[in-house]
Amino acid sequence: MKNTYNLRSIAAKAISQVLDQGQSLSAVLPELQKNISDKDRALLQELCFGTLRVLPQLEWCIQQLMARPMTGKQRVFHYLIMVGLYQLIYTRIPPHAALAETVEGATVLKRPQLKGLINGVLRQFQRQQVELLERAVNNDSHYLHPSWLLARIKQAYPAQWQQILDANNQRPPMWLRVNRLHHSRSEYLELLTQADINAEPHPIYRDAVRLITPCAVNHLPGFELGWVTVQDASAQGCVDLLDPQNGEQILDLCAAPGGKTTHILEAAPKAHVLAVDIDEQRLSRVKENLQRLQLQAVVRVGDGRAPDTWCGDQQFDRILLDAPCSATGVIRRHPDIKWLRRDRDISELAQLQSEIIEAIWPKLKHGGVLVYATCSILPEENQQQIAAFLQRHPEAQLTETGTTAAPGKQNLPHPEDGDGFFYAKIIKK
């Protein structure tokens, strides 16, 4: 039976909601893919994520092919052309099928009179594809990052910026976290081998396993039984560093969607964990993850800047603060970040992080441990943030993560390793 939907028009709508309305893909896609088959859902995600990953290159190509950009109510057709170009350049979809489905998208979007224009632009690209792509390499669109972010990465990492951009522009690896309450990592690796799934352990993070070829979670042994969770290796490093112990009072602040909350409880199942996040909607994901893994924590809505409102005078042995940040370390997973963030956001985020860490510090017991983490690679949110905090608090002692002169540990995104992530482990003397 033929599908009653057109994936290319749905992708164009999703991209429009990201670029024109400032919504994230993760917020937009669930509603748009409700009535789509699993196979087509994977293709829709590829079209959306892929187009946003290489957006500047596609934009540059359109500028060479069209005298005027499509604006206003026609803007969604600009994105439809981008989706068409993405298929021709980056997918194995036969060109005739890519063209036919993309052109048909104009009818679904109620502008059938634009079919000729869209068809003409895509066919012209086919004729000039080799020449256009060669020319595209010689301008800044080749970097596939907005200019403000490119400048910040170059400034922060003069020797490594190109490797960072390359990693950001690739598809992310798929990492798993083995639930040590069910199996050791070596036991689960054996289960993967029996299921013909190739994987390898992370050299540092004790529960992390990388799949050589990503697969659907329903193919993973025991996924529905809670034997394993999909979580990036660098994110797993937070809990390894926190080192939670049974019987302790532990706060996971900015906890949604719950990956670190559940990791804490897998590492210390008798710990008393409070998971707090400001976003009530995202907290439902924390509850879902706890339920799937059959773990228990107290889950509360709360603003990290006002802890008295959600924990009163309670104090904690350990606090994990996965602070709100620019997410510049996870661009390969969320390419829409490149187009949703603005340069001015960085100073605003740094101010918010400072307010949260100041507010939560009094809630840590003497001798207690605070792990500050972000999925950012920008110094303003990381090393500079912690250096300023240590200067304000002589009772705060950095441990295991860098020195006072260069505080914290910065992971950079790597094709065969984890995402960009920063950690600082601090003891209250």
Curated annotation (Swiss-Prot):
Gene Ontology MF annotations: RNA binding; rRNA (cytosine-C5-)-methyltransferase activity
- Identify the EC number(s): 2.1.1.176
Q: Which UniProt keywords apply?
A: Cytoplasm, Methyltransferase, RNA-binding, rRNA processing, S-adenosyl-L-methionine, Transferase
Give the Pfam families listed for this entry.
Answer: Methyltr_RsmB-F, NusB, RsmF-B_ferredox
Whether Transport counts among this entry's keywords is no
Reactions catalysed, semicolon-separated, are: cytidine(967) in 16S rRNA + S-adenosyl-L-methionine = 5-methylcytidine(967) in 16S rRNA + S-adenosyl-L-homocysteine + H(+)
Q: Identify the enzyme class.
A: transferase
Q: Mention one GO biological process in which this protein takes part, according to its record.
A: regulation of DNA-templated transcription
Homology family: Belongs to the class I-like SAM-binding methyltransferase superfamily. RsmB/NOP family.
State what this protein does: Specifically methylates the cytosine at position 967 (m5C967) of 16S rRNA.
Q: What is this protein called?
A: Ribosomal RNA small subunit methyltransferase B
Give the organism the record lists.
Answer: Yersinia pestis
User: What are the top taxonomic ranks of the organism?
Assistant: Bacteria, Pseudomonadati, Pseudomonadota, Gammaproteobacteria, Enterobacterales
Report the gene name: rsmB
